[in-house]
Amino acid sequence: MRVDAIAKVTGRARYTDDYVMAGMCYAKYVRSPIAHGYAVSINDEQARSLPGVLAIFTWEDVPDIPFATAGHAWTLDENKRDTADRALLTRHVRHHGDAVAIVVARDELTAEKAAQLVSIEWQELPVITTPEAALAEDAAPIHNGGNLLKQSTMSTGNVQQTIDAADYQVQGHYQTPVIQHCHMESVTSLAWMEDDSRITIVSSTQIPHIVRRVVGQALDIPWSCVRVIKPFVGGGFGNKQDVLEEPMAAFLTSKLGGIPVKVSLSREECFLATRTRHAFTIDGQMGVNRDGTLKGYSLDVLSNTGAYASHGHSIASAGGNKVAYLYPRCAYAYSSKTCYTNLPSAGAMRGYGAPQVVFAVESMLDDAATALGIDPVEIRLRNAAREGDANPLTGKRIYSAGLPECLEKGRKIFEWEKRRAECQNQQGNLRRGVGVACFSYTSNTWPVGVEIAGARLLMNQDGTINVQSGATEIGQGADTVFSQMVAETVGVPVSDVRVISTQDTDVTPFDPGAFASRQSYVAAPALRSAALLLKEKIIAHAAVMLHQSAMNLTLIKGHIVLVERPEEPLMSLKDLAMDAFYHPERGGQLSAESSIKTTTNPPAFGCTFVDLTVDIALCKVTINRILNVHDSGHILNPLLAEGQVHGGMGMGIGWALFEEMIIDAKSGVVRNPNLLDYKMPTMPDLPQLESAFVEINEPQSAYGHKSLGEPPIIPVAAAIRNAVKMATGVAINTLPLTPKRLYEEFHLAGLI
């Protein structure tokens, strides 16, 4: 059972919005109804006269300090730092919902009403919604310096020549949508001051230590003057890997004498003013020989980062790097540009660029297989990464690669050949199809980012162990896995290990946070090191108590035993702990601490199999069966792993078939910023989600494991697209596959 399960299901778990303090005030934004322009004048007299309003701040009142919001580890290399293009408030609004002012009042309703009473005169500017328009010669600059945020190129050599020399070439133009994370818990921050020099922030964040640094930068105060507390978090999926409302909450309390101020966003504001998934436009080419050997492929990517950089070009660049592991024995070229537009800012979201890139690669490879008459599973088996291969861009060796085994296992469980045979030569309105797609991903951000984790273990008087880790539990089950790691390494029952889930930057060891599927992989070395050190101290103390050599003793199930007679307990850990605490001379509280930097980053692999039915007349896709198979190394907790995979599959189905932020191409206004009009799949829309694992030990890992948090979403959309193509003969390269899009594509193909 998860270590946090009881607290959550009973309601005892405290989330940020559960924190209420005496004298707490509430802040609400005044936001732009236009996507691009200037606030010419502002009239807040009516709002200020409302009883209960404490203050109103505009762009003229906030520090003139641009800051970056992306949740990346800090770097000493100035050229690698995130783009600092944000201000707390702005006169130059760059997207629908940009913030120009903020109202602080004694209660939330008064703050909302006062914000609505603020009137602004606007000067509108041309609106740009696509990267193509942003790069036009006559495009209005959204930021000083132009609309091209950054571009990069990666290549293994003369890739075009290799593609042209292959027996068969395939090209494709692919488009993916802007979507929102839709985590259950909204974005909320609460800040106050307990003395004149320090600000305390409670926030729903994936990155407490990074929040501390960014707040310091945004307000130009020492980082040590900021304390960030992360309580329970109701999901993030990358949205909370940005520093969102914490700088504003800190600014407000500093201006209002240190009183507690809460900034809480509505669901509509989460759509408009937090982060989205980058929309990609991808032009791809691929060269394949008649026997199915992939000779080379190239991708040209345009990434839409919206109004502010946030994670910016990192998304497009990372997507190209992560997919390089998938089919590493071929030529590969990847070029990408990231552009500013007048859309809500895009940032990190589960998969970090990989779902978009894999959609293009796996669609092209499937089209090549169809044209060459090759089984889609066989063409992937022929080219799949194997142990001993290397990333063609970086030369990093692959020490564990279970992709072939994933395909073989999935093919057997899914009954691929039988189902595929049943889908041949179909006529009529209802048509079945099967599809498959693969992925590769990484286990952290190294070497692009510094990967560091810290852990502190302290023994209590009853022999139980408290664990403090900088790694952030945001609902993914990290604390449960950490307790297992410590329990196994020290030699105690899992029930005797308590992970302190609330991070506090004043107390908790340093760790950048929860992102990049890094938590268990990067935290494991620090936890293991601290656990081994604590075990060594325990045995050393036991040796003194028992007049034995430490070499003769070990710790099993919370008891000191002789190595040669492990079945005979000599002493309980509780008895040892009491002696260590209270003996008049020897011992002391037994504790251990470790901080370790990780310099390895193994790839994880996997695939999705899907069986679906297309109702051509209704333009509707129904998934009959879907299976994900993953190589994530040694599976530390099968139940948690299954939950991770099911969650990712559900999100992948949403991205493939349902979800899209509808943004007016002319005005930049978001038309569906709510959960009624933004169509997420609900339980009746989802089939039974199946998962399986291929456990291959990763030798670079502390416990033989690799990433699993993000990968399950990555191949789902491509597999669904490929199954729809098999069912109908129509290759649809734009997501999502909504009834409207299916109607348009089927009409063009002459099916309706």
Swiss-Prot record:
A molecular-function term among this protein's GO annotations:
xanthine dehydrogenase activity
Required co-factors? Mo-molybdopterin
Q: What induces it?
A: Is not solely regulated by nitrogen limitation.
Is this entry keyworded Cell membrane? Answer: no
CC terms in the record's Gene Ontology section: cytoplasm; xanthine dehydrogenase complex
| Role summary | Presumed to be a dehydrogenase, but possibly an oxidase. Participates in limited purine salvage (requires aspartate) but does not support aerobic growth on purines as the sole carbon source (purine catabolism). Deletion results in increased adenine sensitivity, suggesting that this protein contributes to the conversion of adenine to guanine nucleotides during purine salvage.
The name under which this protein is listed is Putative xanthine dehydrogenase molybdenum-binding subunit XdhA
Keyword Mitochondrion listed? The answer is: no
UniProt entry keywords in alphabetical sequence:
Metal-binding, Molybdenum, NAD, Oxidoreductase, Purine metabolism, Purine salvage
Reactions catalysed: xanthine + NAD(+) + H2O = urate + NADH + H(+); hypoxanthine + NAD(+) + H2O = xanthine + NADH + H(+)
Q: Cofactor binding mode, per the note?
A: Binds 1 Mo-molybdopterin (Mo-MPT) cofactor per subunit.
Q: In which pathway does it act?
A: Purine metabolism; hypoxanthine degradation; urate from hypoxanthine: step 1/2; Purine metabolism; hypoxanthine degradation; urate from hypoxanthine: step 2/2
What does the subunit comment say? Heterotrimer of XdhA, XdhB and XdhC.
Source organism of this protein record: Escherichia coli (strain K12)
The record lists Mo-molybdopterin as bound by: 206, 237, 350, 516
Pfam families (alphabetical): Ald_Xan_dh_C, MoCoBD_1, MoCoBD_2
Gene Ontology BP annotations: hypoxanthine catabolic process; purine ribonucleoside salvage
User: Could you say which protein family the record assigns here?
Assistant: Belongs to the xanthine dehydrogenase family.
Q: What does the record give as the organism's lineage?
A: Bacteria, Pseudomonadati, Pseudomonadota, Gammaproteobacteria, Enterobacterales
Q: What is its EC number?
A: 1.17.1.4
